[in-house]
């Protein structure tokens, strides 16, 4: 067995290719094919299932295989997973993305998730997650504040999300959706999937609302911006109520049956809401530009993902020195 493990990295590509291309070969090879984890330990499929099933089975009885594609770049995510008692596979081979898809088809009630595709509590869902104690207005406000401080990255889009992850977790975490990332990886290897390859990378910027630094930003933003933002939000709510009434009044009517004055009134109110939202966004962006901690938290999350480069990295270093 030891000699086989020593040779596995050299023959892995050929074994995986055979398993992917020949059903009968898969049936034979599944008994001796090995999986390698980030601690450089090797397991057969059955051995690995036995290793993880006690701790990596979610609330829906699915067995969750957590994997990394780069042990160095994804080091922080791997360490978080290990701190939970999870084992992380290393799937960095040329055919591993396809091999993962094959195993998901063959292994009953099993899913493969990349270690950086979500927060750790969502990778292996054991119970219902803690609710975030922010209302809709607070979420909208903090979304604008954090999103305004994300530097422009080529072919990358960010969605700001909020999770209650506990005081010990990082204040801001970046994850990438498993499905879209896998589709983009496969598009690089398969003709006819250029659609996914041309799409921008989609990332989640997750704000941990229970971390002291995130709490500080939220509390200070509400305190410092309350006087300017509250009247705008109040006016937006009043306009939205009026818009809802106009839409309800025209519900079920044909376009020609709705009075021109009502159509015009609806358009004007929607324009007013857009204008007020723009004003609110500008005020919050101006505030965030002056609040060094917001940009510092965003940049730290980007840095941990090897996504902070060029001018943004230079500014981060300069800001870090100033804040010491």
Per-region residue spans from a language model:
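Conserved GHKL (Bergerat-fold) ATPase module
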Residues: 1-324
């Amino acid at each position: 067995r030891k000699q086989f493990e020593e040779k596995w990295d050299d023959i892995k590509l050929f074994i995986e290719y055979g398993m992917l291309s020949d059903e009968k070969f898969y049936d034979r090879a599944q008994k001796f094919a090995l999986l390698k984890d980030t601690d450089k330990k090797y397991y057969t499929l059955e051995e690995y299932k036995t290793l993880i099933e006690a701790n990596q089975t979610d609330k829906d009885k699915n067995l969750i295989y957590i994997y990394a594609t780069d042990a160095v770049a994804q080091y922080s995510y791997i360490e978080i997973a290990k701190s939970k008692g999870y084992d992380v596979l290393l799937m960095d081979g040329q055919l591993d993305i396809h091999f993962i898809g094959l195993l998901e088809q063959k292994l009953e009630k099993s899913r493969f998730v990349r270690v950086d595709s979500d927060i750790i509590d969502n990778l292996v869902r054991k119970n219902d997650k803690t609710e975030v104690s922010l209302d809709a207005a607070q979420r909208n406000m903090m979304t604008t504040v954090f999103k305004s401080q994300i530097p422009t990255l080529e072919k990358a889009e960010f969605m700001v999300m909020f999770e209650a992850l506990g005081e010990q977790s990082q204040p801001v975490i970046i994850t990438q959706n498993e499905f879209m990332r896998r589709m983009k990886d496969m598009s690089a290897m398969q003709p006819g999937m250029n659609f996914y390859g041309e799409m921008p990378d989609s990332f989640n910027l997750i704000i941990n609302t229970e971390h002291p630094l995130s709490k500080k930003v939220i509390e200070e933003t509400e305190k410092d911006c309350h006087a300017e933002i509250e009247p705008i939000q109040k006016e937006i709510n009043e306009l939205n109520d009026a818009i809802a009434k106009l839409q309800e009044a025209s519900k079920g009517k044909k376009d020609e049956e709705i009075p021109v004055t009502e159509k015009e009134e609806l358009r004007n109110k929607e324009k007013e809401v857009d204008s007020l939202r723009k004003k609110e966004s500008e005020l919050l962006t101006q505030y965030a530009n002056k609040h060094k901690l917001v940009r510092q938290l965003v940049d730290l999350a980007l840095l941990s993902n090897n996504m902070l480069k060029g001018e943004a990295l230079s500014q981060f270093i300069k800001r870090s020195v100033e804040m010491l």
